[in-house]
């Protein structure tokens, strides 16, 4: 039994929810998002909340139940508040800057990396060693942050590279003489 799936997703004022068949659409101050619920799950909007139920008690339906409810909750939060991920850059000469509609990263390679910002995502660099990725779609914000981090992930000896804000990097000791 899904503990996550049991709870209905409350829709706050300022957000309009529309359920048409297996498609859930949310519209709020930040924008509009939609999610197609898997066919093993029933979704309905009543009393100002979206509830999700499994069609039957099969393992697959029960697995998708909690996942679908979490996806719908992410739609509500995305269109009302939005999501953001912060990245920190550590290392001598490592920096980030905005270059028009692209993010320019200097990460110790022989060339600078130009990262094209996808539609629906906003990237801000408050400091040369800080990147803030924001948007309404939680999955896309996380994906963009992961792609930027992948260019030079943090290494365990000196901790140089791109990491998420607050991420703990397991440090190793160098070799002994």
Swiss-Prot record:
In which family does this protein belong, per the annotation?
Belongs to the universal ribosomal protein uL6 family.
Mitochondrion is among the record's keywords? no
Q: Is Ribosomal protein included in the keywords of this UniProt record? A: yes
Which domain of life does the protein's organism represent? Bacteria
A Gene Ontology CC term for this entry? cytosolic large ribosomal subunit
Physiological role: This protein binds to the 23S rRNA, and is important in its secondary structure. It is located near the subunit interface in the base of the L7/L12 stalk, and near the tRNA binding site of the peptidyltransferase center.
An example molecular function term from Gene Ontology annotations = rRNA binding
Q: Which PROSITE patterns is this protein grouped with?
A: RIBOSOMAL_L6_1
- Quaternary data: Part of the 50S ribosomal subunit.
Q: Which gene encodes it?
A: rplF
Keywords attached to this entry: Ribonucleoprotein, Ribosomal protein, RNA-binding, rRNA-binding
Q: What is the lineage of its organism?
A: Bacteria, Pseudomonadati, Pseudomonadota, Alphaproteobacteria, Hyphomicrobiales
Per its UniProt record, what NCBIfam families does this chain match? L6_bact
> Which protein, by its recorded name, is this?
Large ribosomal subunit protein uL6
